[in-house]
């Protein structure tokens, strides 16, 4: 056996054992079947992780476009420099394997355990992940109906994550870049590596703060207590991003970084509703009647987003299930 094959074998055995323990420990040992791919298959599919195959890139990992057995796939490769991500990589696989049964979660096909950190093989989505400002890398402007559809579908996915398993699972990293869009404009939640379970009978768990700046619940930031509210807050910011076309943190008038949440709060205090809304949202209207209906939808959407981020602390939402139901009702207003 060659030196390279021995190394792959060593990683395969080590990673396989850890993955098996993670899968058994998760969700009462009930997991969806996933395939194991060889490193040769992954390298061939991505042209040796060619830059030309990159879908999106972040500090911890890179998403690549590939083809395995004549099927287009998305391949997630963790950075070898981030070995602190070891536990998170396996949690990503274990939670993804459970969430794959939901139509609004990015389906995990399998993984490769022959690298220092496992690579994930997932379904391919035509439009890839959203940008930080809630748009597409192609520059295609998303119509209002698609934005509303994305919010409704991701709310459904997060609700499932919170309620479908023996323990409440909190995502902790809901943001536009973790939302993939397929050819039918169906939204898929991904990247479950920061997930944490709240044991039955407990209201919260304490853990280090995880997430992206601008999407982290302030209460979580100061107390380090993880509850469902962590995801509700992040989702509310995602709604504001979709509504405004702005990133969660953007350059203000003086080029200084500004929080979208703070910006929206300031505008709401002035009663300048239209200043919040992306002007592209009004571009596909058929007439005055359409405008009236659109404005009622957009205002209801904004009110719900503000409840999610607890703009008025006396009127919070009860949970993601309420958010998902409200978004369905808002969609029916059209």
Curated annotation (Swiss-Prot):
In terms of InterPro entries, this protein maps to:
Kinase-like_dom_sf (IPR011009), Prot_kinase_dom (IPR000719), WAK-like (IPR045274)
Mutagenesis or variant effect for residue 231 to N: In zed1-4; loss of function, impaired interaction with RPP13L4/ZAR1 and Pseudomonas syringae type III effector HopZ1a, and completely abrogated hypersensitive response (HR)
Q: What is the effect of changing residue 173 to S?
A: In zed1-D; normal growth of plants grown below 22 degrees Celsius, but high temperature (above 22 degrees Celsius)-dependent RPP13L4/ZAR1-influenced autoimmunity and growth retardation
Q: What induces it?
A: Induced by the elevation of ambient temperature both in the nucleus and the cytosol.
Site feature location: Required for Pseudomonas syringae type III effector HopZ1a recognition and interaction with ZAR1: 231
Give the record's keywords alphabetically.
Acetylation, ATP-binding, Cell membrane, Cytoplasm, Membrane, Nucleotide-binding, Nucleus, Plant defense
Distribution of this protein across tissues and organs: Expressed in seedlings, young leaves, floral organs, shoot apical meristems (SAM) and inflorescence stems.
Sites binding ATP sit at 55-63, 76
Q: What is its main location?
A: cytoplasm
Q: What happens when the gene is disrupted?
A: Reduced resistance to Pseudomonas syringae expressing HopZ1a. The double mutant zed1-6 zrk12-1 exhibits short inflorescence stem and autoimmunity symptoms when grown at 25 degrees Celsius.
Q: GO terms for biological process? A: cell surface receptor signaling pathway; defense response to Gram-negative bacterium; regulation of growth; regulation of immune response; response to temperature stimulus
A GO CC term attached to the entry: nucleus
Q: A GO molecular-function term, please?
A: ATP binding
Q: Which residues form the Protein kinase domain?
A: 49-334
Where is this gene product found?
Cytoplasm, Cytosol; Nucleus; Cell membrane
Subunit architecture: Interacts with RPP13L4/ZAR1. Component of an immune signaling complex made of, at least, SZE1, BKN2/SZE2, ZAR1 and ZED1. Binds directly to SZE1 at the plasma membrane.
Cite the domain annotation text. Answer: The protein kinase domain is predicted to be catalytically inactive.
This protein is called what?
Non-functional pseudokinase ZED1
**Native organism:** Arabidopsis thaliana (Mouse-ear cress)
